[in-house]
């Protein structure tokens, strides 16, 4: 994706970025949403990778303490999630409810993303504010199996 197309996409999404673009990649709109978070939420790997290549920060959190990785998981985009993990996005960040991306993915039955997060080293023992782990919230048998295996490996 070239810079002109990226600027057009950003403008269409409500980001009014000044020149040079690289100095404003982490500017925010409503709810402290960055362009990277928005691209992740849309599951747009092309835009997400272009933003990362220009230096967008994958560690930033919005007003709810969700980061771009959370939004990639919400969008069910394994490609975006993998790119963000590779770029250094934190995967154990807990949002205002104490949920991590892994807890969200397990509770939503997003098995490929649960597998990706566990392989990246996500902590399956973290709990929500209500004291639930990803395993306890697993929405399907496949997620439950992956989480039980991770739990067993943690105690081995």
Regions found by a protein language model. Give the residues of each.
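Ankyrin-repeat-protein effector appendages
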Residues: 1-15, 120, 129-156
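Intrinsically disordered, low-complexity regulatory segments in ankyrin-centric signaling systems
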Residues: 1-42, 49, 53, 154-156
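Ankyrin repeat A-helix N-terminal signature
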Residues: 9-12, 38-44, 71-77, 104-110, ...
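Ankyrin repeat structural motif
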Residues: 13-19, 44-52, 77-85, 110-118, ...
